Design a protein with these regions (language model features):
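Terminal alpha-helical segments
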Residues: 1-142
Length: 142
């Protein structure tokens, strides 16, 4: 891959959509459980909750794209993943802004030694929940 093309799509169908939907459910559940625990300086659980919420949003986006487009994103350039999700009508377009916000905090919560506020973590979990609801809608039998 060239430096400009840091992502690709892979073929995906109903099986992949179901698997990614189940992963999204698990990530969102774990984020909620971790968020409910008391935070302390040694164990920064709010950051962990937000990081897991981001993973839930990514898995939900994969589920939506798999079922609506027959493909999902793989790579480092998440702007391409946002573009793919926006094409996955109608659910992807509806939660695009939540996905953009989750990806916007990804580096902070996963790679930086920065304290995540309770408000930031709660917002990430809400965004991830909305994405999960959209993925469940997209994957529900018609």
């Amino acid at each position: 891959m060239s430096p400009r093309n840091r992502g690709k799509t892979i073929m995906a169908g109903e099986d992949e959509a179901r698997a990614r939907l189940n992963a999204a459910r698990a990530f969102v559940s774990v984020a909620e459980l971790v968020y409910a625990e008391p935070d302390d300086p040694v164990l920064p659980l709010r950051g962990v909750a937000a990081a897991v919420a981001v993973l839930g949003g990514i898995a939900a986006a994969d589920a939506i794209c798999s079922v609506r487009l027959g493909e999902m994103f793989r790579g480092d350039d998440h702007t391409q993943a946002v573009d793919l999700l926006a094409r996955a009508q109608p659910e992807g377009a509806r939660v695009r802004s939540d996905f953009v916000r989750l990806l916007g905090i990804k580096d902070k919560v996963q790679y930086q030694a920065i304290i995540v506020t309770p408000s930031e973590a709660a917002t990430a979990i809400r965004q991830s929940r909305r994405m999960l609801a959209a993925a469940e809608e997209a994957c529900s039998p018609r």
